[in-house]
Amino acid sequence: MEAETTLTEKMRAALRISSTSDRITEEINDCIAACKKDLQDVGVKRLNETDALIVRAITLYVKAEFGFNGNADKFHNSYNSLKVHLSMSSEYNTVSETDTGTETEGAENGSMGG
């Protein structure tokens, strides 16, 4: 849970929000969760919150949802481009042994979520 708090704080900083209001924090966390689900839906299995591209994707998604600086469309388009890249990259669309502890290639029950 600590990593999620860190990610929430990164998003708060990216949005230039200094308020620690519970309502704003909840909205940021909802956006983070929605982004992760969206990435999973296109086949991204490796959602490491310390990975620079995953953090960037979440940042773009959150900025689009919050309409940051009136550039929601720009951020949404950038997010979609990165989402496509992540979904096609074997680094992100496969689960490694270190992620799961077992080899899951070809196994139906090896997917995240669901």
Predicted regions, residues:
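Conserved short "hinge" loops at termini or chain/domain junctions
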Residues: 1-54, 77, 88-114
